[in-house]
Regions:
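Hydrophobic/aromatic end-of-helix segments at the C-terminal termini of transmembrane alpha-helices
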Residues: 124-125
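Short hydrophobic/aromatic, small-residue-rich stretches within specific transmembrane helices
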Residues: 10-17, 143, 147, 178
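Hydrophobic, membrane-facing alpha-helical anchors
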Residues: 14-26
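Conserved, well-structured core segments that form the ligand-binding/active-site neighborhood
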Residues: 119
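Short arginine-rich
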Residues: 19, 152-153
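Juxtamembrane transmembrane-helix boundary motif
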Residues: 1-8, 23-116, 128-138, 148, ...
Length: 178
């Protein structure tokens, strides 16, 4: 059914990310570039945010989801080209708090946005880590590990919410995951 194409793509994307995220997390762990002390508290927020994000995405039209994804791509592209996060981090190391009280909150918005657009969260987690005073290596490694809970919770959310609607799902699909 045409009305669920984007939701199916996002849910399936998150399900496939889960497996590659495990491999990536292990690889970065072996290089000692994962800040595990942040992964766990970030994950709490990410799991909650990803499930809520999947539920919110399920209420949006294909057209609105396409616009959200397009805007995300433009903003991330501008950030990557401009290097704004790295420039700010050089100017003011740790200009975003990564205290034990703030980290789950950061995780929740990362999980929420990531599950809406179908990504593992690295585009948000890496800049957050850099803004929090960590180096790029730690940011990428920690983001890789955080992709596991985002992908798992997001995919489960899409499976659940896809079963609560009256649409013709493709044969073999579990909710919005194919």
């Amino acid at each position: 059914e045409a009305s669920i194409i984007v939701l199916m793509a996002i849910g399936t994307s998150l399900a496939s990310i889960f497996f590659s995220a495990i491999s990536s997390a292990l690889s970065h762990h072996n290089k000692r570039s994962v800040e595990w002390s942040l992964v766990m508290p970030l994950s709490v927020g990410m799991i909650v945010g990803a499930v809520i994000g999947a539920g919110y995405a399920a209420t949006l039209s294909n057209e609105n989801l396409k616009w959200i994804i397009t805007i995300f791509l433009i903003v991330i592209g501008i950030e990557m080209i401009s290097g704004l996060t790295q420039a700010l981090a050089k100017k003011d190391k740790g200009f975003i708090s990564l205290s034990k009280f703030m980290v789950p909150g950061h995780g929740s918005w990362i999980g929420f946005l990531s599950s809406i657009i179908g990504i593992g969260g690295g585009s948000f987690t890496t800049p957050l880590m850099i803004a929090g005073g960590y180096n790029i290596r730690q940011g990428i490694g920690t983001a890789a590990a955080c992709g596991v809970p985002i992908a798992a919770a997001g995919a489960i959310g899409y499976m659940y919410y896809g079963q609560t609607v009256e649409v013709n799902l493709p044969s073999g699909a579990v909710g919005y995951v194919f």
